[in-house]
Amino acid sequence: MSSSEVKANGWTAVPVSAKAIVDSLGKLGDVSSYSVEDIAFPAADKLVAEAQAFVKARLSPETYNHSMRVFYWGTVIARRLLPEQAKDLSPSTWALTCLLHDVGTAEAYFTSTRMSFDIYGGIKAMEVLKVLGSSTDQAEAVAEAIIRHEDVGVDGNITFLGQLIQLATLYDNVGAYDGIDDFGSWVDDTTRNSINTAFPRHGWCSWFACTVRKEESNKPWCHTTHIPQFDKQMEANTLMKPWE
């Protein structure tokens, strides 16, 4: 594994606790306003385009739009939190992670396995990416991040890619992070409006809360139970309420 692959595919180790990262920095970079047009989605990459078509054919419209919003939230958050790692991260690797992170909730897979949706989804994503021509390193980086995207906590480390997908999904789903009081303001109002307008929420928080309850009912051992009252946290998401 080359050092360039480590950086491009987000393998750099960071604390699993985003609060620990913030505390070590002292302050985040200055906030900037963006429109969706200001942030380039790597649609010209054939692999990304094929993965996008794959998920669009399988995910619900609500989940697809969530996945796209996550790409933009994460891009903005990364630039403020860890700009050096953000600069080196491949936009394609990030886009693939976002597009595929909830593939385990697709109807074709959600009830066809006893595995937790995030763990099965990571394995499925790796299989799909290898078939589509991804490098092994990139496919494994995406899989690792997806498998750990609900693995929030305070102890240990995670890949930068894994931390970023955690932060971006929590931003969209909950709008809050335990111990980080200003988490909602990590993305400014103008940017938040642009992203939510470009990829409408269609009642996402309520919709995905129902998905969480369904998984926890069908699979009481599932990894989603690691996040206490995740469904209720989503339904209490005041940050995104104006666009729900």
UniProtKB/Swiss-Prot annotation:
Catalytic reaction equation(s) = urea = cyanamide + H2O
PROSITE patterns from the entry? HD (PS51831)
Q: How does activity depend on pH?
A: Optimum pH is 7.7.
Q: How does activity depend on temperature?
A: Optimum temperature is 55 degrees Celsius.
Instruction: Tell me how this protein is used.
Output: Transgenic plants expressing CAH acquire resistance to toxic cyanamide. Moreover, due to its innate ability to convert cyanamide to urea and the broad-spectrum antimicrobial activity of cyanamide, the CAH gene can be used to facilitate plant growth promotion and biocontrol of phytopathogens.
* UniProt KW Membrane keyword: no
User: Which keywords appear in this protein's UniProt record, sorted alphabetically?
Assistant: Lyase, Zinc
Its cofactor is: Zn(2+)
Top-level taxon of origin:
Eukaryota
Q: Which InterPro entries match?
A: Cyanamide_hydratase_HD, HD/PDEase_dom, HD_domain
List, in alphabetical order, the GO biological process terms annotated in this UniProt record: cyanamide metabolic process
Q: Which residues form the HD domain?
A: 63-174
UniProt-listed Enzyme Commission number(s)? 4.2.1.69
Keyword Lyase belongs to the record: yes
Q: Name one GO molecular function term.
A: zinc ion binding
Q: How is this chain's activity regulated?
A: Compounds that react with thiol groups, such as Ag+, p-chloromercuribenzoate, and iodoacetamide show a strong inhibitory effect on cyanamide hydratase activity. The enzymatic activity is also sensitive to chelating agents such as EDTA or o-phenanthroline, as well as to reagents containing structural elements of cyanamide, such as urea, dicyandiamide, azide, hydroxylamine, thiocyanate, or cyanate.
Q: How does it assemble?
A: Homohexamer.
Known function: Cyanamide hydratase involved in the detoxification and/or utilization of cyanamide, a toxic nitrile compound distributed widely in the environment.
Miscellaneous comment in the UniProt entry for this protein: This enzyme is highly specific for cyanamide.
Family membership, please give it.
Belongs to the cyanamide dehydrase family.
What is the protein's given name?
Cyanamide hydratase
**What organism does the record attribute this protein to?**
Albifimbria verrucaria
Tell me the organism's taxonomic lineage. Answer: Eukaryota, Fungi, Dikarya, Ascomycota, Pezizomycotina
Gene encoding it? CAH
